[in-house]
Amino acid sequence: MDLEEGATVGLALNSSLAPTRNIEILCPVNTDFTQWFLPAFYLVVSLMGLLGNGVGLWNLCATSRKSGWNALGVLVCNLGVADLLYVVTLPFLVSYYLQGRVWVFGPGWCRLTRLLFHLNLYASIGFLTCISVHRYLGIVHPLKMLGRCQTLSPSVSLSVLVWVWVLIQLAPDFSFSKMDRAGVRCHDTTHHENLDTYMPYILTITMTGFAIPFLITTGCYCHVVVVLRRNQNVDPILKRRSITLVVLVLVLFSVCFLPYHIFRNLNLQSRRWQLQGSCSQTLRNIYVSYQVTRGLASLNSALNPLLYLMASEDLVMRLTAFGHTIGRALRFLWPSQAQRHLSQKKLSIMDDEECEEVSNGL
């Protein structure tokens, strides 16, 4: 009886893994790259994200309590909260990939972990778009928007709308399973059986969550740069900070968000082709490229803290002072070779003088 039950369980397990195994057998890919690249990348991002967002939010709140909150500070604060919600889940993904893509934390935590990734992704895009519109209105239409851009009510209301809109976009994702039937794999998208219904949803959220905000952000910042270059009366510090912000946000979109959305859609389509029997080196390259872009997409949580430099003017001075303090402490604990040589030379001279005094005394 025990053998029969064991055989039944084994058959059930094999049948549950059949779709996954079939696609891997039809078009085998080297998953070793994923199992060392993503854990290493996620570990670095989690450490940088926790430190950067923690210090940045602390300084932003401390500064805002003294001088008062402004619209940009509210938007950046929401961006930091979205980053922290995501980076706290990265250690679980590190464990998942180091164990050979075996998820041991249960289906509920798998779904939450994947949800927080997409929540961070599209909340970051949403708030970066709001920041670009804020900069556009403040620089291109300064007189018309005087006072409106600095009050808190519009920025708070806008932040609430961004969160609500992101949750509405992600709501359909709850209907797609993230775990395989055996409860072993925790998919970042969904199981192979759901691809036909998942693809239209992903294409829709790519348009509403990324493409449209990307066009708005690019249009706003292109106009901002044109105005700043034409206007010679703009304060040089404001011009430099504004252009730095433009470059930073466009880098985030170009490096973190654009490649991910391109290769996520390509990877889903390649999985459909593989299920139909197709297999080529191009499909394998798409898979590897998609894994790289997943790491790049998470990198925005480590790069977003740079925006705190734009929202808090004294953060640079605080970080500089902190760096000098650390430098003095390190020099005290571990003096340089030149300092050690000088100290040894002084001691040698003092010893020689003492010896001469003793000789003279004798």
What are the functions of these language-model segments?
Residues M1-V29, Q274-C279, E313-L362:
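Intrinsically disordered regulatory tails of 7TM GPCRs
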Residues S46-G49, N78-L90, L158-L170, T206-F214, ...:
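Alpha-helical transmembrane segments of multi-pass membrane proteins
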Residues Y42, S46, N59, L85-R101, ...:
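Helix-to-loop junction signature of class
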Residues V81, H187-L195, T206-F210, V225-I262, ...:
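Intracellular effector-coupling site of seven-transmembrane GPCRs
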Residues F33-A40, G68, G73, C77, ...:
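Alpha-helical membrane-protein architecture signal
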Residues T20-T31, Y97-H118, H141, G147-P154, ...:
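Loop architecture of class A 7-transmembrane GPCRs
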Residues T34-Y42, K66-I131, G138-H141, L146-R148:
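Extracellular TM2-ECL1-early TM3 structural module of rhodopsin-like
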Residues T34-T63, L215-Y221:
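First transmembrane helix
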